Amino acid sequence: AEDGIRDLVRSRGLGDVYKRQGIGEIKNKLWDPLKRAFADLEIRNNIVIGGAYKDKIFVSFVSHLTGTFINQWLGVPPTNKTIYLRTCHCHQITNNKIIKSYILIDTVDFIRQAGYWPIHKSLGAEGMWPAPITGDGENNSNLDKELSMKSLHQSLTMQISLGTKPEMEPTFSTDNIRYNLINDHEQKKYWHPKMMWFGPSGVGTARGLKGFVDHHQLPFRLTFKERDYNTIGHYVEIGDGNYSMTGGWHSIKSKYGSNHWLGFEPNNVMVEMRVMDFYLHHEGLIRENWVPIDIAYILKQIGVDIFELIHKK
């Protein structure tokens, strides 16, 4: 595998735990501890897509690292049971070699599977993310550039619509905001009636626009009212057939202003969010959206160390 990785490769993931440069450091600090903890580790890909953005080539994945948890990892004691590490990763390719990787492993979901839950109950449903309903996420070989561009355009246009903020209307109650987001907001025209929104552990999964608004979007908007989606921007925006993907490291920076999202008391700390969005475009609309967010890193920024909480239990 090292033949496909340049010496200057950079890997970013798990908050600042694994912000590493060079093959040796990535091997010693990321992969070796993983392989010690999960000796039979293997990867299962649900989505594989690629494309170009700003003259850079990217390949992105929604995967699960699967193995038997036999030795501690990140200070969490082993269970000797199967663990599925939800892993979303995006790699920049130059001359057929990886020069930079962005890796989000859902450590909160890992903690949940290990039998711990030291934070507030998720609003959405917890559980393993399924593969795309169309069954073609890993075997997507559509080279139709027009379709790829159409998919990316749809997801980016939907994201732009999120900049409309009914929560900033001084006369709007929470019920008014909720009604607007479900019934009147521009986003409605982009989402499939049977949409699925697969969120990170700590937030959970939601079905339909109503579920999405109730279990993630409205609480998120009430907590981060001053968020700005556009100033920082993305490091990647790609379309590949009926799929598209965007990512920011970080792409959003805002104050943690209420306890609606994640449940912790507001402290107005400025929070950075590292996030990816993977989209399935089906029947002319966005059917499914997989959204890895580094929740452990967000919690750490507001003064909540989820790994310390485990040891206090």
Where are these regions (language model features)?
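A beta-strand edge to alpha-helix "cap/lid" segment located at domain peripheries
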Residues: 48-147, 221, 234-313
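A structural feature that tracks compact, well-ordered secondary-structure segments
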Residues: 6, 29, 62, 91, ...
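Long, positively charged binding patches that form subdomain-scale interaction surfaces
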Residues: 201, 207-210, 215, 224-232, ...
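Short, low-complexity N-terminal intrinsically disordered segments enriched in polar/charged residues
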Residues: 1, 118-181
